[in-house]
Amino acid sequence: MTKHFYERNDWLLNHETNKTFEEVQWMTEDEFRQWFIDLRKAVVHSWDTMGQPPRVGWSEDAIKKQFKEMYGFSVHEFEHVDELTGEKDVIRNTSVVGNAANQWFPTMMKTRINYTKNDDGLSIYDHFLKDELLEKTLKYSKRHFKRDSFYAYSNTIKVNEIINVGSYNVKFKNGNDFVRWFEENNIRQYGYDYWVESRDDDEEYSGYNEQLKGAKYLEVTQDILETIPTKSTMNIKSHDQKKYRLRMYKYGQKIFPVGLKAFRVSWCQYAVNFPPLTAKLLYEKFTKHVKNQDRIVVYDPSSGWGGRILGAMASRTSIPLHYVGTDPNTDHTIDGGGGTTSTKYSDLADFYNSAKNEGVLFEQSNTYEIFQLGSEVVRDDSSFQTYKGILDMVFTSPPYFAKEAYSEDPTQSYKKFTGYDAWREGFLRPTLETAVEYLRNDRYLLWNIADAKFGADMLPLEKDSKDILESLGMQFKGVVKMALAQMPGGNRIDPDTGLPKAKNFCKVNGMWLKYEPIFVFYKPEP
């Protein structure tokens, strides 16, 4: 039986280009360049011939185990109070359970991200494939793999931090003493080494982690550099600096899988999935008042990367839940057998239901129906019209106009409508009109969208969505704050206000977090 998902990428992890950190550390400039060229070729080969992008992935058994956890997962523990407002409107989901849904969609990181109106955005895949991007990616890779910018393989050493190596239990007030101890006692015999990192005199931590502010680290001065082996000083940018910081590491650490995140975090933006457990929470929370009917029908106008259909299948509602989704992306079409076609959404849902019911005496599954049409035209489909007036919830994360080029299909909304105004009237408005018309009274519509920078313009996606929905009689009830697991770059604190510089932020358990807004609307009784 054909599998429509990729599994753990053992081919890349076992490939000869998966060097250890010390091997990369000790490479000359030319050696590093050739290693990286070979790595790019290996990644493209894995992606194109085996359908495996540069992500680790889980095995089929691990996916089943993960999916089995979802139905009984206590998702309501994700809800938190925002300490800035006192409202319990923050969802902080740090679990990876359900993330295996990504493995049905290897084209996620082939999605181009547009920053201008020229539709010339690049994807992570482009950065591996295109020769003209070699120098850019080489520069980033030196930073991440040779200089370990994510601190994935080597750590700075704090002043008076206890170091346990072999039979030694020592601490140092300065880096020069550390170097003398390390070299005189041949500490490398215990499988450890260090490298010297250039630091600017005025470099100071400016992030949100209070524990890192004011921390002092072991540093060495110029006069001791000549006593340090060349292999440990290959990353020094300038020998004219007054001080250099020490980074210690253990031998034998492979660059991957840990290093795979570097491609997602730094090269360019990439498409992300909606967290399945967060979707499960929202389905359960906003349909709990639905009673006295045979099933709960939820509608997803942009099925995307499968996160919401998986969350729907895992939802634990008082009555069975039926998911209706639509998406025109033909990349998600698969052979259904017997000359028919199906979708990866169907395959994902069926796989989940099979895993959930495995070994269970009384099987119970939520159901689904998928349409491969744009949400602006799906109302013309006779089968979809059977849902008119019986939807119990509408919930999606729609396209941000042309910000993300999900595929090159002419049916994609950004291809059909080349300008924002035309897209708003030709896609956004009819999509919302259908959603409201087909929604029952006393029901909710959740809209995960945010204003997007596009060239010199800031697209008013939030206001336009709100204006259209309110013109259709929907009542705005507030915002659910979906906290992000990481805050790279955007977590900096404004020294004048003491607040994060991000547009949307909240505070949970004393920690600043960015969030994506999910706008909540209600359709009242007439």
Spans of features found by a protein language model:
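Class I S-adenosyl-L-methionine-dependent methyltransferase catalytic core
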Residues: M1-K68, G72, D82-F128, E132-Y151, ...
